[in-house]
């Protein structure tokens, strides 16, 4: 949904800024947390009344929401996330992960993208761009 889309957008912005700011000596990092013990499920209290909806509230009461809430409640502590951020910044990491156990999921995504690129490289429609060098790399 919208929450996941905004997280993906932040990663894309970070990657773009990293490329744009590298020549100026500015490093950019993005925090990619999984389940952290936060009060995210209490955030509805901050939504202005004109934007509140019974549909949103009822969707949050579903089984997906209760399972996700349990995972957040059992997530890592915010203080550990903060220490991990400092550690990663000191090491110059661009992507700051809190849950390395998500690696197989990310590898699967990267492999799917790689396979799609390999197929595109074989397309007769794209042969004129296959060997073009990209200035951004």
Regions found by a protein language model. Give the residues of each.
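Hydrophobic alpha-helix immediately C-terminal to the catalytic Tyr-X-X-X-Lys motif of short-chain
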Residues: 9, 13-21, 31
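Terminal hydrophobic/aromatic helix or amphipathic segment near a protein terminus
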Residues: 95-111, 115
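Catalytic tyrosine of NAD(P)H-dependent dehydrogenase/reductases that use a Tyr as the general acid/base
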Residues: 3
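SDR active-site lid
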Residues: 23-100
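Non-catalytic terminal and boundary segments that flank Rossmann-like NAD(P)-dependent oxidoreductase
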Residues: 115-137
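Charged, glycine-enriched surface loops/patches
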Residues: 63-64, 108, 120
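Active-site helix of classical SDR
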Residues: 6
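Glycine-rich loops and low-complexity Gly/Arg-rich segments
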Residues: 10-14, 53-57, 120-124
